[in-house]
């Protein structure tokens, strides 16, 4: 019989949908039969309230094949005109070592992992992060460092907040900012200070530090215009007032310059972009945050520490986790959860690959080229603002500023205008002698009349950095920076670290509320295109036409997926999206002349919600949940009656973190709107909504969108993320602005929430690719299959572990909560025991004890097929059988596969085995493990020991052997 497929079908423009979605049609039918429903449509009807379901498909273009999407995006990228940028201001051209590019940035073993909450299967990433902390403490001269922040500007804002927290002796409400800080840093700090109620002074330290009263001050080192001030003296002045001294430092300059820690700084922040991370039109990049040990419990962000496992072997873990927002909620040090793990480890590997000598050589080359440029400009008659500098010159040019800028543009060069009458030039590791010749030609008004060898001779003879400014000895002297200088050794080291971790290239990661879905290769390819990576974030927007068009298209795509009218791409993490959304609400009410301070937050909310509300200076009022896990309407009514027109917003996650679609969501929205307040719908669970229901249509005024969840940006082992916000029309005029790039429709008074205008712009192509290849049909199918997979797991496990919450028809949303409390009471087995035992089956654990203590929250996503779901369910059922044996006395409560989990190769290779179960039961409890197994490299880690004996820098190399 002849095949009658149409030619259109043979082109298979929608084939990516079946690549992204795990179950095939045969598996779908089997899973639906297990659920006793006839079709996916019937399942959705029984799961999602009819009042919110969309009747029409999403207004998106038809899906296209992978190669077509890549061609379309390549044509957009080609519209970016990448000039040579000497703009500086915290962003510089750099070279990513190819061994790191290929084996880390382009490697799913690194970019698809999750935050290392289960350290026994994350020792590789943890070692990379410990290396990062070692690098930062070495370069800054500080006692400790955290494991990265989102960007330099938000790190500065976090340092300001920390200065207020720890400065108990100082009652001032004022903070001092060096006027030579980067403009984007000043803007973000002003925004944060406004909502904390801090007063801000921006002035020259040499003029104003001694006479002002403040609880903290930040100094830029070197300054934005390249000058190097009397940092040590200024630090002493600040500390004489019982205020904290914060230094924002350029990481490359610290290779040569005296460290801020050596000069007495309390906190040192900055950005690691120069250490092998592309500019990417603003990100993503890893910021650093270093501090004195006495402030460790007041520090934001994650800290990696050294501990021991149950066999006494050295092991790494995230230390002092009780500081984090998901535990302390509105009392947390910060709302930040995602940081920039992937970029942090890349920068550490950059330092390790080059080593102390190589990094020193790069820094000295940059400095000598800068001295040569200074000699050339002086010989042409130009006046330099500073005679002391590292890599940046500020040239006083008077009324020649515009002609020089025009001349530079003609030569495809970007310079930086420093106010009126001055230009700055920042050199980088990519600067060559030919570049110097081109720069001098711009200032000479024609071909360079200068001879490079003579300029070099002058530069070598002239010392612009006095001895008291230079570092005493080389930085990066720890052994880890002298081990891996050949590509062979670095390649093997990176592979060793990768092999110690479980990422999506090994198995499903069923973390609830995290959406660990496929990060398709086609989506990742554009991230490393030079047209995207080499663009300076403050280059004229006319040079970034491709980016601008891609932003516009992505904003329309995200608006279509959510039902909102406007999208801001600036927030570079979900936490920052929450903060930006709440500030938008505040600005809206300010414009109306209304003062509202209450934020209602359901008991089940993400811990980030109350932390974000507190940062926005809102008072958190908790709304109770009923016995079914839904918002308690009676309690909501009582809180509305009590606070009325003082309510600014409610923050509600939908579907809820309890894993159900609440039937009364529209009723909740109506009640909030009735008192003039706004509805913030947390977008963490959008993966169950896209194409099915739109928050902008069923009552939401604003939502943040976790692009690293629903829209396929990978988690990177703990970052990068992206958290743009969608708003309805009435909130659009109040979206975040930026001091250095015009964002259409915004004004400066709205404030700034991220260092870069469009956040981590270079990873936005990932979400663009995903939506373009899925189209309306695929986006809806992704949500439907996510719901199908979660319900299949719930059905298979419910006779073994109680499902805590479900909807009125007995179905869950895209995730489900297993209630382990009865088992714990009967057997003594904890949720941690089960999480560690899952490692022996090759799985990362679900989310533990959130949002309810004593539970596991499971989210399989649409990308996993029935085989993988069954593999996970079989593991959980086998674990339940082991618990039954403990309950019945067949296994001792203190010696069984759960309390001893996870088991390592050291365990099974040891000549002694004195346990109540066999080695096979320990390590190969199911048959599939005989064919392939991912081994934990350490046994269960001692958390208490690690916090009591806090070590956050690298041990000696011998300790790793």
Curated annotation (Swiss-Prot):
It comes from the Bacteria. It catalyses: N(6)-[(R)-lipoyl]-L-lysyl-[glycine-cleavage complex H protein] + glycine + H(+) = N(6)-[(R)-S(8)-aminomethyldihydrolipoyl]-L-lysyl-[glycine-cleavage complex H protein] + CO2. GO terms for biological process: glycine decarboxylation via glycine cleavage system. One of its GO terms (cellular component) is glycine cleavage complex. The modification N6-(pyridoxal phosphate)lysine is found at residue 709. It is an enzyme of class 1 (oxidoreductase). InterPro entries: GcvP, GDC-P_C, GDC-P_N, GDC_P, PyrdxlP-dep_Trfase, PyrdxlP-dep_Trfase_major, PyrdxlP-dep_Trfase_small. Its cofactor is pyridoxal 5'-phosphate. Keywords: Oxidoreductase, Pyridoxal phosphate. It holds the Pfam family GDC-P. One of its GO terms (molecular function) is pyridoxal phosphate binding. Its EC number is 1.4.4.2. HAMAP family: GcvP. The glycine cleavage system is composed of four proteins: P, T, L and H. The glycine cleavage system catalyzes the degradation of glycine. The P protein binds the alpha-amino group of glycine through its pyridoxal phosphate cofactor; CO(2) is released and the remaining methylamine moiety is then transferred to the lipoamide cofactor of the H protein. Belongs to the GcvP family. PANTHER family: GLYCINE DEHYDROGENASE (DECARBOXYLATING), GLYCINE DEHYDROGENASE, DECARBOXYLATING. This is Glycine dehydrogenase (decarboxylating). It comes from Teredinibacter turnerae (strain ATCC 39867 / T7901). The gene is gcvP.
């Amino acid at each position: 019989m002849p095949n009658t497929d149409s030619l259109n079908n043979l082109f298979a423009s929608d084939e990516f949908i079946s690549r992204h979605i795990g179950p095939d049609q045969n598996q779908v039918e089997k899973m639906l039969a297990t659920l006793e429903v006839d079709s996916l449509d019937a399942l959705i009807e029984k799961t999602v309230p009819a009042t919110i379901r969309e009747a029409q498909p999403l207004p998106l273009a038809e899906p296209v094949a992978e190669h077509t999407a890549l061609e379309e995006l390549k044509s957009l990228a080609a519209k970016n005109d990448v000039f040579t940028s000497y703009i500086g201001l915290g962003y510089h051209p750099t070279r990513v070592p190819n061994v790191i590019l290929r084996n880390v940035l382009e490697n799913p073993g690194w970019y698809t992992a999750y935050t290392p909450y289960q350290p026994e299967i994350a020792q590789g990433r943890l070692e990379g992060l410990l290396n990062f902390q070692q690098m930062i403490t070495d370069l800054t001269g500080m006692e400790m460092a955290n494991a990265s922040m989102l960007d330099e500007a938000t790190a500065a804002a976090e340092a300001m907040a920390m200065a207020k927290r720890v400065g108990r002796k100082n009652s001032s409400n004022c903070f001092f900012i060096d006027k030579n800080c980067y403009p984007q840093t000043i803007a973000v700090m002003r925004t944060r200070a406004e909502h904390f109620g801090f007063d801000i002074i921006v002035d020259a330290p040499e003029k104003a530090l001694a006479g002002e009263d403040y609880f903290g001050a930040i100094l830029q080192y070197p300054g934005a215009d390249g000058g190097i001030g009397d940092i040590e003296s200024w630090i002493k002045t600040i500390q004489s007032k019982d205020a904290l001294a914060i230094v924002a430092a350029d990481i490359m300059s610290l290779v040569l310059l005296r460290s801020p820690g050596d000069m007495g700084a309390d906190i040192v922040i900055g950005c690691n972009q120069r250490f092998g991370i592309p500019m990417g039109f603003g990100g993503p990049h890893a910021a650093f945050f270093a501090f004195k040990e006495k402030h460790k419990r007041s520090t934001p962000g994650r800290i990696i520490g050294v501990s021991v496992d149950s066999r006494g072997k050295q092991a790494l873990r995230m230390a002092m986790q009780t500081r984090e927002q998901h535990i302390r909620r509105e009392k947390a040090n910060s709302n930040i959860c995602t940081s920039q793990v992937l970029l942090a480890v890349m920068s550490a590997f950059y330092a390790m690959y080059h080593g102390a000598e190589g990094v020193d050589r790069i820094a000295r080359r940059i400095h000598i080229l800068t001295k040569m440029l200074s000699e050339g400009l002086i010989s042409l008659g130009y006046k330099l603002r500073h005679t002391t500098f590292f890599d940046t010159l500020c040239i006083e040019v008077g009324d020649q500023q515009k002609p020089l800028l025009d001349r530079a543009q003609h030569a495809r060069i970007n310079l930086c205008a420093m106010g009126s009458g001055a230009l700055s030039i920042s050199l980088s590791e990519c600067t060559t002698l030919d570049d110097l010749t081109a720069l001098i030609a711009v200032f000479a008004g024609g071909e360079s009349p200068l001879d490079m060898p003579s300029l070099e001779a002058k530069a070598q003879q002239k010392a612009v950095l006095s001895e008291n400014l230079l570092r005493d000895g080389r930085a990066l002297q720890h052994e880890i920076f002298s081990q891996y200088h050949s590509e062979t050794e670095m390649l093997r080291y990176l592979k060793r670290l990768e092999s110690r971790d479980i990422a999506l290239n090994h198995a499903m990661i069923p973390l609830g509320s995290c959406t660990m879905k496929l990060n398709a290769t086609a989506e990742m390819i554009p991230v490393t295109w030079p047209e995207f990576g080499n663009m300076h974030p403050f280059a004229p927007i006319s040079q970034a036409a491709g980016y601008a068009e891609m932003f516009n298209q992505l904003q329309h795509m995200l608006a279509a997926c959510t039902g909102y009218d406007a999208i801001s791409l600036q927030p570079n993490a979900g936490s920052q999206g929450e903060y930006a959304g709440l500030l938008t609400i505040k600005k809206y009410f300010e414009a109306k002349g209304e003062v509202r301070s209450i934020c209602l937050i359901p008991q089940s909310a993400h811990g980030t919600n109350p932390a974000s509300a507190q940062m926005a200076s809102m008072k958190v009022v908790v709304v109770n949940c009923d016995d079914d896990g839904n918002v308690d309407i009676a309690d909501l009514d009582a809180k509305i009656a009590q606070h009325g027109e003082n309510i600014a917003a409610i923050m509600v996650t939908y579907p809820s973190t309890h894993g159900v679609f609440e039937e009364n969501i529209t009723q909740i929205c109506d009640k909030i709107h009735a008192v003039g307040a706004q509805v913030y719908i947390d977008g963490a669970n959008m993966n169950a909504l896209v194409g099915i229901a739109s928050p902008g249509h069923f009552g939401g005024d604003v939502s943040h969108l976790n692009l690293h969840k629903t829209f396929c940006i990978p988690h990177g082992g703990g970052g990068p993320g992206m958290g743009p916000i969608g708003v309805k029309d009435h909130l659009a005029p109040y979206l975040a602005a930026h001091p250095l790039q015009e964002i259409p429709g915004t004004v400066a008074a709205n404030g700034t929430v991220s260092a870069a205008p469009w956040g981590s712009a270079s990873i936005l192509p990932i979400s663009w690719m995903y939506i373009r290849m899925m189209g309306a049909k695929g986006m809806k199918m992704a949500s439907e299959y996510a719901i199908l997979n979660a319900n299949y797991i719930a059905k298979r496990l419910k006779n073994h572990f109680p499902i805590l919450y479900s909807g009125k028809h007995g179905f869950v949303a895209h995730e489900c909560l297993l209630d382990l409390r009865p088992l714990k009471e009967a057997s003594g087995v904890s949720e941690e025991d089960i999480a560690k035992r899952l490692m022996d089956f090759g799985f990362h654990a679900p989310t533990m004890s959130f949002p309810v203590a004593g539970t596991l929250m499971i989210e399989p996503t649409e990308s996993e097929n029935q085989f993988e779901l069954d593999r996970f369910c079989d593991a959980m059922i086998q674990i339940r059988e082991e618990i039954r044996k403990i309950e019945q006395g067949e296994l001792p409560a203190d010696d069984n596969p759960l309390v001893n989990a996870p088991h390592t190769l050291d365990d099974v290779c040891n000549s002694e085995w004195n346990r109540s179960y066999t080695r096979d039961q320990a390590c190969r409890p199911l048959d599939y493990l005989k064919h392939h197994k991912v081994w934990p490299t350490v046994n269960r880690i001692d958390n208490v020991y690690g916090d009591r004996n806090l070590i956050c820098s690298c041990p000696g190399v011998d300790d790793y052997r």
